[in-house]
UniProtKB/Swiss-Prot annotation:
GO terms for cellular component: cytoplasm; histone deacetylase complex. Residues 135-163, 190-259, 281-306, 325-399, 431-450, 486-553, 915-928, 959-988, 1158-1180, 1336-1367 have a biased composition (Low complexity). This is Type-2 histone deacetylase 1. Its EC number is 3.5.1.98. GO terms for molecular function: histone deacetylase activity; histone deacetylase activity, hydrolytic mechanism. Residues 400-430 have a biased composition (Polar residues). It holds the Pfam family Hist_deacetyl. It comes from Dictyostelium discoideum (Social amoeba). It is found in: Nucleus; Cytoplasm.
Length: 1489
């Protein structure tokens, strides 16, 4: 479809070629220039290579050979969104490129006699360009450019002429693409000023006179139809006014005078109808739906050596019936069919005709009737030329393709009357199709200037699929000023008496011209009879026109009549010379009255505009696309109900193109398809791309299939390509990291658009089902045809057998008689043999078509199965990806919100304190409010939302603190009551302790308020204490509270169906280099990987994942500070590939750790600095120590990120239920790494860089909204980094069991000053009560000094339990309380050389506390360095002990966490022991109880 700028560009170009051929590929437009000429190449330059045949187009001069098959370039799947004919695809090229690629025009001897043609082509092959030329020569040019000359009717479209030396040439492939220089009418268009210009400029045109011949003959034939004189009147009336014009218009290709004089066999009104050249032309023009009947007179027979062929379209079938062969049929029509046929060149009028055009219409109709009353054929012809011009302004809203009108939106449902005859008299060359804006002014479409300066409308292009319905969007209501009512003819007959004189003069001139011809008497008689007929039928003119409304437009293509053509030719010669002068004079007189009459018509055509739409619905009752149009509203101006139908329907040029579009739109999702379907689809794509497919899919059955399925295929193709476009756009947005924070792409509208694809699933399925039904119907039809042919062949063979049997039964007679009988028999069987051969040919062709239909059916069946099985999967998969992306964005926003809120509170607190210092107490509040207002710009449109957010955040924090205080007070009160009851039974020593406990309780509230204020002021520094749970609950609209204990027991007790364990590791972790004698060597990980592989061969429950991705930095920053992460990045980037360096030491030995700026050194109670056994030196008085234990290399940070990524991936698989538990072989370890790397009181990070278990815990908390996560650390070293990060965060519960002694790294988790310590006092049952009581007194004294409610309660419980002489492990354990105690930390230190039984008894405390906590997820810092063979510690555990430890934790996970447990490797430095412990750990995780 040409664009506006293409049409405007053509206006400035006046070329020898038609405009459609200039824009077509290879310089030839098969749609508009179907007339081609056979030229044997041997007649010029000898034969071509391998006997190729050559043809040229007589309209544009383009040549091609039979071997030069044009193959349309295939659509590349990568250009998926722009490749199906909607939008701007790669085939949308500019006009300059088209002209550069077009084949240059070269004149030949045949074309030298052709005058320069107008760039405007007709719509169809047999039509003549009407109203374009300024003289008779211009008419001939229109004939040449539009492919209808005097030899047009000598042959049909597909047969070879008797004198042609070669068969019909193959027509070049029709490139009906959008880049051609014509456009398909999609929307209804207003009457442009081009048609007005045609009417105005054609006052001196003889082409209008030719048009008038057909229309005049048509009207008089309608009149004569009532009188019963069909053929004589039609022939006589069609001849009288066009003879002079025909002789002058056929100068280029041979004189029609010679043709006409050679055919003078008619002697009467009825006469012989053997020569049906003009009749055939009339039928051909009518079959083209919008061609004018003047072609009937214009076309004649010639004996030229060239062969006319009509290329493409359904007209070949019609022309094969109506040809010039002696055996062609001459059907006799009924009166009603004649009336329809004689008014069958029109179409539905276009909206908003100009008044001038309607005025022309009025005068034309008036002149028709008055001229009939005056018995003047010349005047009738002149007036009918204007009538044709008027009817050409009435555009058909439907697209027209190769003679068959395309149905409009309302044709499938409306059933009404036929349109008036005016709408059938439209010349296709006068049609004008809409501009995008559907305006009436001439600025929208600038007319193309022809050779003779006549303005012409832009070239139009019919769609290929003649029956496929056009899908329109937002079609507007046609203007009521477009159609002349039937009653207007009668009204106008009374207003045209002024032209009678001219008509009489024309009649006299015609009589004079007839006297100069050979058959004067016959002409005069015919004129007299014709005049009488005209007089008798003028009274019925209006009624006959009204009767035409009862016939359908579709029937006009199949109505034939056979006037006496020889008699017509004689009459044409008689009036040829003088007719043109009178026609020109009369047109000038008529032009003056048109404008006045047209104003009157505008008020009369309002009612007829909508009735005409109902008439047009009758035209396509045989269309197979009515069910496709059912979803669309019956009114033509109603919008499309389905939003996925965009703009317009762009038909495919061939079935092959249609199939390629569809498969290319689905093949982009091949990765989502099963293997067998993917291979089948690739095979189909390969088959369709082969060169032989062009001929295989170019049959009658393929055209029929294309007409049936093209619309549905277009909708399916468009759906899949829009789906691919949407998904691609989403991916690009998700991968774009530079989207501003203020821009939210995935809003509600975008998600609704994507969800709409899922809603269309059923609609596309129905489209597929419709296509399969249509293909099944076509296949069944072909099978029936094949069976009929087989039946006929069998019957013929029976006849042959019977004949032979009869011959054998005849008695022997004389030899001469036998010869005669044999000769007669052979002569009688010769036609039968010919019939059988033709039937065999038809049988083979039908068999090929059946196989082709079956292939297409299997193709659509495959795509239908793909749609059913994979469409929803594709949509759901992308939906999950969108959900994951949105969750990540929300979680990151939550973290940012929390950080910003803390900073805001800190800023507001700082301003509040400064105001208190600078101002009086009376002005403090006012100043504080003013400062608060100045923190945020008041012009910010989000200030209200931000203020609400901050106030809600403060309220949540206050409420949580108040709730915590209330809970503590309630617990204290309950403990007090219990203790009071127990203390009543104690001695005086216990009473003193109760008094101290009461004093402690009284001071608890003050201590809590002080600690609350201190935490609020230091919130920005202690970022690890941020309560992200509070922010998460706020953003998610206060999600549900913690589940009660009884409910959680029932829910969490659901065990997985099948236990699966995943082991994760990455070989990049081996690239973390350390010195050769370092205990944390890569050999450790190699040993663990070997153990994993060995265990996988023994158990089918282990799943190995060896390619985890690196973790995103945003999750690292939830645990570690940005400064520390930047330090690691800078340090590792500066190192060479094999360089190893201590973490906190420069080349000059200076400390570079993040804590080097700290001025505080942890001091023990004795005033000495804490000794760090893991460091090379100890420090006092604030001096920092270098880390001689932890080393880094070039890839150390990447290895740590891989380990952290493996941890998060393990959590994902466990939380999603893919596996029940997971083991991560992490290296380097991580539980000693604090927020800034080094923890307080240490100068070494204990081989650790990133704290994997803390990163995983934060990841699970934020991503899966978990409220209770337990972290158990049974490494021999205390997890000081994990404790520092998770302390005081109530969403986590950290429990560590480890060895503790002075000088043993890290020196925390058991000494004085440690938090949450549980001391195990092993004693004998024979120890008396007093010794135990004294021990408890010491603990109680320490507890009274530390003012902690929870620890005091526990101590009192332990004290009372000791008074009751309990002997269990839990009764022997007490928690050491101090001022730094955190309620979510439990440390169980063990003495060196502790036995395995002591370790297991102490570990039972952890199990009991886990059951009380009821976690939702369990994470394990799994260290195997407490093994007996590991020399970094002195504990004595064996492999079976680790099995028992792991089994007990797995049981807790099965009880409370649905089996969700993730274990991360920490320590373990003996290679053999590490391997054995890994296998023991995996076996305990994978076993069932």
């Amino acid at each position: 479809m040409s664009t506006i700028h293409q049409v405007n560009e053509m206006n400035s170009r006046v070329g020898e070629k038609p405009a459609c051929c200039i824009g077509a590929a290879r310089g030839h437009c098969t749609a508009h220039c179907p007339r081609i000429e056979d030229v044997l190449y041997s007649q010029r330059k000898g034969k071509t290579n391998k006997g190729a045949q050559r043809w040229r187009c007589k309209a544009c001069g383009t040549k091609w050979t039979s071997k030069g098959i044009i193959i349309q370039p295939p659509v590349v799947p990568d250009t998926i969104v722009n490749s199906i004919g909607f939008g701007n695809g790669p085939e949308e090229i500019s006009m300059e490129q088209l002209r550069a690629n077009a084949r240059p025009y070269k004149k030949t001897k045949t074309g030298d006699n052709i005058l320069q043609t107008s760039p405007f082509p007709s719509l169809f092959g047999n039509s003549i360009g009407m109203g374009l030329g300024g003289n008779n020569n211009n008419i001939n040019n229109n004939n040449n450019s539009n492919g209808s000359n005097s030899s047009n009717n000598s042959h049909n479209g597909g047969s070879s002429p008797s004198g042609s030396p070669i068969p019909s040439p193959p027509s070049p492939v029709s490139f009906l693409q959008r880049n051609s220089n014509v456009f398909v009418p999609i929307l209804p268009q207003s009457n442009g000023n081009n048609i007005n210009n045609n009417n105005n400029n054609n006052s001196n045109s003889n082409s209008n006179n030719i048009n008038s011949n057909s229309s005049n003959s048509m009207q008089l034939q309608n009149n004569n139809n009532n009188n019963g004189q069909l053929r004589s009147s039609s022939s006589s009336l069609s001849l009288s006014s066009s003879s002079s014009q025909l002789n002058s218009s056929s100068n280029g290709n041979g004189s029609s005078r010679n043709l006409l004089t050679s055919q003078k066999s008619a002697q009467s009104l009825i006469g012989n109808i053997n020569n049906n050249n003009n009749n055939n032309n009339i039928i051909n023009n009518n079959s083209n739906n919008n061609t004018n009947n003047n072609n009937n007179i214009m076309n004649g027979t010639t004996t030229s050596t060239t062969k006319p062929v009509v290329v493409g379209g359904p007209m070949q079938i019609l022309n094969s019936v109506v040809n010039n062969s002696p055996t062609s049929s001459k059907p006799i029509l009924s009166s009603s069919s004649q009336n329809l046929l004689y008014n069958s060149s029109g179409s539905i009028p276009q909206p908003s005709q100009s008044p001038q055009n309607n005025n022309n219409t009025t005068i034309n109709n008036n002149n028709n009737t008055t001229n009939n009353n005056n018995n003047n054929n010349n005047s009738n012809n002149n007036n009918n030329s204007n009538n044709n011009n008027n009817n050409s302004n009435n555009n058909n809203i439907n697209n027209v393709a190769n003679g068959t009108p395309r149905p409009s939106l309302q044709t499938s449902r409306l059933q009404g009357k036929l349109p008036s005859p005016q709408q059938y008299n439209t010349s296709p060359s006068h049609q004008q199709y809409p501009s995008p804006k559907n305006n009436n002014n001439s600025n929208n479409i600038i007319p193309i200037q022809s050779t003779y300066g006549q303005p012409t409308p832009p070239p139009t292009k019919p769609p290929v699929s003649s029956k496929a319905p056009a899908v329109y969007h937002n079609v507007r209501v046609p203007s009521p000023n477009t159609t002349v009512d039937n009653n207007n003819n009668n009204n106008n007959n009374n207003n045209n008496n002024n032209n009678n004189n001219n008509n009489n003069n024309n009649n006299n001139n015609n009589n004079n011209s007839n006297n100069n011809n050979n058959s004067n008497n016959n002409n005069n008689n015919i004129n007299n009879n014709n005049n009488n007929n005209n007089n008798s039928n003028n009274n019925n003119n209006g009624n006959s026109n009204n009767n035409n409304n009862n016939n359908s437009n579709y029937q006009q293509q199949h109505q034939y009549f056979s006037p006496n053509q020889n008699y017509i030719q004689q009459q044409v010669q008689a009036v040829q010379t003088q007719q043109a002068q009178h026609i020109l004079a009369q047109q000038q007189a008529q032009a003056q009255q048109q404008y006045i009459q047209q104003l009157q018509l505008q008020q009369q055509t309002l009612a007829h505009a909508q009735s005409q739409a109902a008439h047009q619905a009758q035209t396509l009752t045989h269309s197979r696309h009515n069910d496709l149009l059912s979803p669309i509203d019956s009114q033509i101006w109603a919008p499309i109900q389905y939003s996925w139908i965009q703009t317009h329907y762009n038909p495919s040029s061939s079935l092959l193109e249609c199939l390629k579009r569809l498969i290319n739109s689905v093949v982009v999702f091949s990765n989502e398809l099963p293997v067998d379907q993917r291979l089948k689809m690739i095979n189909f794509l390969t088959t369709l791309s082969s060169p032989s497919s062009e001929s295989q899919y170019n049959t009658n059955a393929s055209k029929q299939m294309l007409n049936c399925i093209d619309n549905s295929v277009f909708n399916i193709t468009k759906h899949y390509q829009m789906l691919y476009q949407s998904i691609s756009k989403h991916y690009s947005m998700m991968e774009d990291s530079f989207i501003p924070l203020t821009e939210v792409y995935f809003d509600e509208n975008e998600i609704n658009k994507f969800i709409h694809f899922s809603d269309q699933f059923k609609i596309i399925e129905e489209q597929f089902e419709f296509i399969l039904r249509e293909l099944s119907s076509i296949r069944d039809t072909l099978i029936i045809k094949r069976e009929n042919i087989e039946k006929n062949i069998i019957e013929s063979s029976k006849f042959l057998n019977n004949s032979s049997n009869n011959d054998n039964g005849i008695e022997e007679i004389g030899l001469e008689q036998a010869k005669q009988d044999t000769t007669r028999l052979l002569e009688s069987l010769a036609p039968l043999e010919t019939t059988l051969n033709s039937m065999e040919i038809k049988f083979k062709s039908i068999q090929k078509e059946i196989s082709m239909v079956i292939r297409v059916f299997s193709f659509f069946e495959l795509l239908y199965n793909i749609h059913i099985n994979c469409h929803q999967t594709i949509v759901e998969k992308h939906s999950r990806q969108l959900s994951t992306y949105m969750i990540d964005v929300i979680q990151q926003s939550l973290y940012n919100c929390d950080v910003i809120s803390v900073a805001y509170n800190r800023l507001k607190t700082g301003l509040f304190n400064s105001n208190n210092n600078n101002n009086n107490n009376n002005n403090n509040n006012n100043n504080n409010n003013e400062e608060d207002d100045q923190l945020i710009d008041t012009t910010n449109p989000f200030i209200n939302k931000l203020s609400d957010l901050l106030s809600k955040y403060e309220n949540i924090s206050k409420n949580n603190n108040n709730n915590n205080n209330n809970n503590n007070n309630n617990n204290n009160n309950n403990n007090n009551n219990n203790n009071n009851n127990n203390n009543n039974n104690n001695n005086n020593r216990n009473r003193d302790r109760d008094r101290e406990f009461e004093r402690d309780n009284n001071s608890n509230n003050n201590n809590n308020n002080i600690e609350k204020e201190r935490n609020r002021n230091n919130r920005i520094r202690d970022r690890d204490n941020m309560d992200i749970d509070n922010i998460s609950s706020f953003i998610s609209n206060n999600q549900q509270q913690h589940i009660g204990q009884s409910q959680s027991v029932q829910q969490s007790s659901q065990l997985p169906k099948e236990r699966k364990v995943m082991a994760l590791y990455h070989t990049t972790c081996l690239d973390h280099l350390v010195p050769d004698d370092h205990p944390e060597s890569p050999k450790r990980l190699s040993s663990v990987i070997k153990a994993i592989n060995d265990f996988s061969r023994q158990s089918d429950r282990l799943i190995i994942k060896n390619d985890p991705e690196e973790i995103n930095d945003k999750w690292i920053l939830t645990v570690h500070s940005p400064e520390y992460l930047r330090l690691l990045e800078d340090l590792t980037e500066k190192l060479d590939a094999n360089e190893i360096r201590p973490l906190n030491v420069n080349n000059d030995g200076a400390s570079t750790g993040i804590n080097q700026f700290s001025t505080s050194t942890p001091i023990t109670t004795t005033g000495t600095a804490t000794v760090t056994p893991g460091s090379t030196t100890s420090s006092t008085n604030g001096e920092q120590c270098e880390d001689g234990d932890t080393f880094v290399s070039k890839l150390s940070l990447h290895a740590a990120k891989r380990s952290a990524g493996a941890t998060c991936q393990a959590i994902d698989n466990v939380m999603k239920g893919n596996v029940t538990s997971a083991f991560v072989a992490a290296r380097p370890p991580g539980h000693h790494a604090g927020r800034d790397g080094l923890t307080s009181g240490t100068s070494s990070q204990g081989f650790c860089l990133l704290n994997h278990v803390c990163i995983g815990a934060k990841y699970a908390q934020l991503k899966y909204n978990l409220d209770k996560i337990a972290i158990i650390d049974f490494d021999v070293h205390h997890g000081n980094g994990t404790e520092e990060i998770l302390s005081n965060d109530q969403g986590f519960y950290f429990l560590s069991i480890h060895m503790f002694e002075e000088g043993f790294y890290p020196g925390s988790g058991g000494g004085v000053g440690s938090i949450g310590v549980v001391n195990l006092n092993e004693f004998n049952e024979q120890n008396d009560y007093d010794d135990d009581d004294n021990n408890n007194d010491v603990n109680n004294n320490n507890n009274n000094n530390n003012n902690n409610n929870n620890n005091n309660n526990n101590n009192n419980n332990n004290k009372n339990n000791n008074n009751n002489n309990s002997n269990s492990i839990t009764q022997q354990s007490t928690i050491t309380n101090n001022s730094n105690c955190k309620g979510n930390i439990v440390n169980i230190p063990l003495d060196p050389k502790s036995s395995a039984s002591s370790f297991l008894k102490a570990f039972s405390i952890i199990i009991d506390k886990l059951n009380d906590y009821q976690p939702e997820l369990i994470l394990i810092s799994c260290g195997f360095d407490a093994h007996m063979e590991d020399h970094l510690a002195s504990l004595c555990l064996l492999e079976e002990n680790y099995v028992e430890i792991t089994r007990s934790l797995r049981r807790v996970a099965d009880r409370w966490c649905k089996g969700r447990l993730v274990s991360i490797l920490e320590g373990g430095y003996n290679i053999n022991a590490l391997r054995q412990c890994t296998i023991a750990h995996l076996s305990a995780l994978s076993e069932d109880d």
